[in-house]
Amino acid sequence: MPWMPKILGHQVLKIGGLSGEVTTNLPMHHQIILIEKITPNLTALCNAKVSLVQVSLTELPFIQKEIHTVFLMNTLNFAQDPHQILRESHRVLADDGWIFIALFNPLSPLIFKRKMGDYPLRHYPAWRVMDWLSLLNFEVIEKCPIATKNKLATIFSPITLIIAQKRTYPLTLNPEKVRSKIPVFLEPVNAFKLKS
């Protein structure tokens, strides 16, 4: 991925089981996987640089602006409260931090699935999640479909990836109007007055 070299910092947060299974070759010092229920697959990933924590995904146990990158790989599709997960991700993400969100594409053949295994599945269009991100002051850097099994990525690809960066300042500024003092000789009232 061309965005990986741009990611700097010390900690990456992977929220959800699918996020934890994504391998990233980042130079981060520490990767933290947050999950509501620990599974043997995720336990096998733990080492000196990877921690596994069982928590509620809607109340992250971190202080504000501590994490530099957040991965949400299909986490929002299985969440009961995706807005709260995004708000918590925004809270713990450092200024100019990155967020990677993968979603099941509602235009793919998965549209007819309502469950995956024991988990209820909800489809969110990418434009809706991008709107949620803009309300949290994220700048969407890229949105791209991801194909599977050597297929060409199209609008009907099963997964859509959204890459966004947290911005410190609002994206739309409303500057106050600055009125400069107009020189006397340019004022319409004084244009035809003679100097004495």
What are these regions (language model features)?
Residues I7-L60:
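Class I SAM-dependent methyltransferase SAM/SAH-binding core
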Residues W98-H123:
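Conserved class I S-adenosyl-L-methionine
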Residues Y119-K143:
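Short alpha-helix
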Residues V70-F71:
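Hydrophobic beta-strand segment of the Class I
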Residues H83-W98:
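A short glycine-rich, Lys/Arg-flanked "PGG" loop and its adjoining helix->strand segment in the class I
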